């Protein structure tokens, strides 16, 4: 981090937790003085549109109006990823001010994105929590679940199954475990789909497609309110927002369901 001078120039990333400051739905751009950033701490984390991209250290009090990162999923993917990166870096810096080994204060390293203990020298890098997310298909049907956190009296969002990868577990094992734990369904033909940084606050969603193998839906009631098979040609419940990897998985799987039905 450096103390910003009045003429420091570029795009500016300001965060408050998972919220960001935007001007007309875009990152503020210009010199530090014009955006009231002079004297604040910031670090350059790359470039955006051929100009320096600065991440400003979070302030305890800030009268600017911030918008939730969740409300920005419709932005172009590269822009959403830039915003997610800023949120995750500031989360890391805010939660690693002290050494996890000896408890003394840390400081940022100069040559890489990390913090180092000023007492014992222990170095810590940004923590990324890997999570799997999977769409399961059975012929021309897709398995969708209404998680308890998504439930509402009107039904709420139905989405794909997801969960954190456990210690010592492969992504493939995590997918099979999560699907079976939450729905009692066994799967096969597992294949990688894609990934998405998920800065709430520091996950990496790794997406898969899978086919049904066996079993009847048996809910993990502590996690899942409802789960059903939905045919591609029937009315669907409320789905995750456009821009999420969950929505992309659902779209691709519904296309596979449609193709399967045409081949019957």
Curated annotation (Swiss-Prot):
Mind telling me which PROSITE patterns this protein's record contains?
A: NUDIX (PS51462), NUDIX_BOX (PS00893)
Give residues annotated as binding Zn(2+): 99, 102, 117, 120
- Residues forming the motif Nudix box are 163-184
Q: Name one GO molecular function term.
A: NADH pyrophosphatase activity
Give an example GO cellular component term for this record. cytosol
Q: Which cofactor does it need?
A: Mg(2+); Mn(2+); Zn(2+)
Q: Which HAMAP family does this chain map to?
A: Nudix_NudC
Protein name in the entry: NAD-capped RNA hydrolase NudC
User: Source species, please?
Assistant: Haemophilus influenzae (strain PittEE)
């Amino acid at each position: 981090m450096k103390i910003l001078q009045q003429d420091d120039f570029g795009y500016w990333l300001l965060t408050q937790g998972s919220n960001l400051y935007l001007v007309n739905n875009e990152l503020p751009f210009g010199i530090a003085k014009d955006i009231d950033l002079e004297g604040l701490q910031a670090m350059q984390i790359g470039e955006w549109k051929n100009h320096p991209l600065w991440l400003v250290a979070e302030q305890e009090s800030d009268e600017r109006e911030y918008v939730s990162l969740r409300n920005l999923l419709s932005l172009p993917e590269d822009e959403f990823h830039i915003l997610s990166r800023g949120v995750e870096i500031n989360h890391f810096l805010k939660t690693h001010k002290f050494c996890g080994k000896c408890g003394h204060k840390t400081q940022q390293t100069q040559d890489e994105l990390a913090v180092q203990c000023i007492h014992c020298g222990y170095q810590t890098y940004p923590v990324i929590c890997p999570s799997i997310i999977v769409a399961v298909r059975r012929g021309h049907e897709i398995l969708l679940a209404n998680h308890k956190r998504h439930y509402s009296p009107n039904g709420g969002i139905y989405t794909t199954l997801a969960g954190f990868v456990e210690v010592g577990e492969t992504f493939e094992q995590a997918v099979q475990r999560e699907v079976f734990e939450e729905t009692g369904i066994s799967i096969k033909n597992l294949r990688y789909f894609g990934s998405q940084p998920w800065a709430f606050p520091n996950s990496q969603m790794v997406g898969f497609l899978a086919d049904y193998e066996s079993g009847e839906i048996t809910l993990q009631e502590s996690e899942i309110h409802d789960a059903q098979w939905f045919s591609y040609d029937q009315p669907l419940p409320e789905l995750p927002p456009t821009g999420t990897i969950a929505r992309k998985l659902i779209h691709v799987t519904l296309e596979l369901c449609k193709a399967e039905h045409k081949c019957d």
